[in-house]
């Protein structure tokens, strides 16, 4: 899930890992992780020998999208809210966007309209298959945390990178 962008065809959301292999289901390029922790393409060129180098390339791609005003997360979400640090209360569906101006979360019932500028936080709490519910992006402040479970698959890693890069670009 961290390697969401194919190093060969540059498409996003088609990378799937299983065991020691990761494969792009768009172009078919497949890599295997060897006993030394290096990636090896099963056919053709190995673009990145090490996972951190691939991840750094993804970060640079996101940064370029932001600079060129092409970055946008736009997805429907299930919304969980934590206000008392005791439990997360699932409150319904909504829509989450993230761009150069930060996050905007709106519930479909109109009860929630939260925005968070890029300067609110350097990092983003995001996790994969969180408590077996699903991938999660968490935004909020000291008063309330919003746990957003995106309907779109494979957006969490890119969103985390984008939040970090937006913070750096806007400070």
For each feature predicted by the language model, list its residue ranges.
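Anionic N-terminal interaction surfaces
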Residues: 39-96
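Short, solvent-exposed coil/turn linker segments
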Residues: 14, 32, 38, 50, ...
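Acidic, Ser/Thr- and proline-rich intrinsically disordered linker/docking segments
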Residues: 118-171
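Generic recognition of long tandem-repeat/solenoid scaffolds
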Residues: 22-25, 105, 136-140
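Short, surface-exposed beta-strand/loop "edge" segments at domain boundaries and coil↔beta transitions
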Residues: 30, 87-89, 107-114, 141-155
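Phosphoinositide-binding peripheral membrane targeting modules
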Residues: 72, 81-134
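Cys/His-rich short segments
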Residues: 1-45
């Amino acid at each position: 899930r961290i390697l969401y962008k194919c190093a060969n065809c540059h498409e996003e959301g088609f990378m799937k890992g299983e065991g020691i292999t990761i494969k792009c289901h768009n172009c078919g390029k497949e890599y295997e992780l060897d006993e030394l922790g290096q990636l090896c393409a099963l056919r053709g060129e190995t673009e990145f020998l090490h996972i951190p180098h691939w991840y750094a390339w993804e970060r640079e791609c996101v940064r370029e999208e932001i600079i060129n005003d092409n970055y946008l997360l736009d997805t429907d979400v299930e919304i969980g809210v934590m206000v008392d640090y005791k439990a997360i209360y699932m409150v319904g569906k909504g829509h989450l966007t993230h761009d150069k101006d930060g996050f905007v979360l709106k519930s479909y019932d109109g009860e929630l309209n939260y925005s968070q500028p890029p300067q609110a936080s350097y990092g983003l709490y995001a996790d994969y298959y969180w408590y077996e519910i699903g991938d999660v992006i968490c935004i909020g402040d000291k008063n309330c945390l919003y746990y957003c479970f995106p309907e779109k698959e494979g957006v969490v890693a890119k969103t985390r990178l984008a939040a970090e890069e937006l913070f750096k670009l806007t400070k």
